[in-house]
Amino acid sequence: MAAPTMKERQACWGARDEYWKCLDENTEDASKCKKLRSSFESSCPQQWIKYFDKRRDYLKFKEKFEAGDFQPSKMTAKS
């Protein structure tokens, strides 16, 4: 598989950004962003989609942690 061209990368990043914006505006309700998710999936290589999904999860976790909203699980609290 050839590496994506600059135009393909920009289309992927744009689709990702639109999807993430939709999630932010709809309090993470993915059902309201299905069309944008489809566009994201059709614009990006599968490996990139996995990476971006994990990256978003990490960034949201980090945001909560830094804001002091993180609550450790009961298993973690016992350790």
From Swiss-Prot:
Pinpoint motif Cx9C motif by residue range.
12-22
Disulfide bonding pattern of the chain: 12-44, 22-33
State the source organism's domain of life: Eukaryota
Q: Which GO terms describe its biological process?
A: mitochondrial ATP synthesis coupled electron transport; mitochondrial cytochrome c oxidase assembly; respiratory chain complex IV assembly
Q: Which UniProt keywords apply?
A: Disulfide bond, Mitochondrion
Q: Which GO-annotated molecular functions does the record name?
A: copper ion binding
- Where in this chain does the record put each CHCH domain? 9-52
Positions occupied by motif Cx10C motif: 33-44
Self-association and partners: Found in a complex with TMEM177, COX20, MT-CO2/COX2, COX18, SCO1 and SCO2. Interacts with COA1, MT-CO2/COX2, SCO1, SCO2 and COX20. Interacts with COX20 in a MT-CO2/COX2- and COX18-dependent manner. Interacts with COX16.
Instruction: Name the job this protein performs.
Output: Involved in the maturation of the mitochondrial respiratory chain complex IV subunit MT-CO2/COX2. Thereby, may regulate early steps of complex IV assembly. Mitochondrial respiratory chain complex IV or cytochrome c oxidase is the component of the respiratory chain that catalyzes the transfer of electrons from intermembrane space cytochrome c to molecular oxygen in the matrix and as a consequence contributes to the proton gradient involved in mitochondrial ATP synthesis. May also be required for efficient formation of respiratory supercomplexes comprised of complexes III and IV.
Q: Would you tell me the protein name for this molecule?
A: Cytochrome c oxidase assembly factor 6 homolog
